[in-house]
């Protein structure tokens, strides 16, 4: 059983998939930092809110009544919140990852198209019988289906 697992785990596609997942997680962390630390503060300043991650709506007060200045304060008090600022950050994160993935796949597809050989058109090997319209070999002098004699 261990031998079978070892064969499975060391196959090329399994190893490639594992490397892809690890790189994907690392890339996701980079994009998250890009969104949280570089993009969203700038967008927040332009839109008048310095930090999108602290945009929330209190649905139910917690042990300590509000108003709360940060999401952490609301959560510490036990308030139930809708965290739409974090959701906006997540959407921006997704858009960046999706766009980066699109660019990678587009480039891979372009490389594949460059390396593909154009399809070779083969000469036809059959023709249609003029009497019964069945496909017959090009060199046939008589149709095997309707037994008509064929000219030339």
From Swiss-Prot:
SUPFAM superfamilies cross-referenced by the UniProt entry: Gated mechanosensitive channel
Claim: Phosphoprotein is one of the keywords in the record: no
Membrane keyword on record: yes
Highest rank taxon of the organism: Bacteria
Pfam families: MscL
Transmembrane segments annotated in the record for this chain: 14-34, 39-59, 85-105
GO cellular component, one term: plasma membrane
Gene3D superfamilies recorded: Large-conductance mechanosensitive channel, MscL, domain 1 (1.10.1200.120)
Annotated compartments: Cell inner membrane
Keywords: Cell inner membrane, Cell membrane, Ion channel, Ion transport, Membrane, Transmembrane, Transmembrane helix, Transport
Any GO MF annotation of the entry: mechanosensitive monoatomic ion channel activity
Membrane topology value: Multi-pass membrane protein
PROSITE patterns: MSCL
Entry-linked NCBIfam families: mscL, PRK00567.1-4
Function: Channel that opens in response to stretch forces in the membrane lipid bilayer. May participate in the regulation of osmotic pressure changes within the cell.
Description of how the protein assembles with itself and partners: Homopentamer.
Family: Belongs to the MscL family.
PANTHER family per UniProt: LARGE-CONDUCTANCE MECHANOSENSITIVE CHANNEL (PTHR30266:SF2), MECHANOSENSITIVE CHANNEL MSCL (PTHR30266)
Protein name (database record): Large-conductance mechanosensitive channel
Species of origin: Syntrophus aciditrophicus (strain SB)
């Amino acid at each position: 059983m261990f031998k079978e697992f070892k064969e499975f785990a060391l196959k090329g596609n399994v190893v490639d998939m594992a490397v892809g997942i690890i790189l994907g997680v690392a890339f996701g962390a980079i994009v998250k930092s890009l969104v949280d630390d570089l993009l969203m503060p700038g967008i927040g300043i332009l839109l008048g809110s310095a930090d999108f991650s602290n945009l929330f709506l209190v649905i139910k007060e917690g042990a300590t009544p509000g108003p709360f200045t940060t999401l952490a304060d609301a959560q510490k008090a036990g308030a139930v919140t809708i965290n739409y600022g974090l959701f906006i950050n997540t959407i921006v994160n997704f858009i960046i990852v999706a766009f980066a993935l699109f660019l990678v796949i587009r480039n891979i597809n372009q490389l594949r198209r460059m390396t593909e050989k154009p399809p070779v058109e083969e000469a036809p090997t059959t023709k249609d019988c003029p009497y019964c319209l069945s496909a017959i070999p090009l060199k046939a002098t008589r149709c095997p289906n309707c037994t008509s004699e064929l000219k030339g």
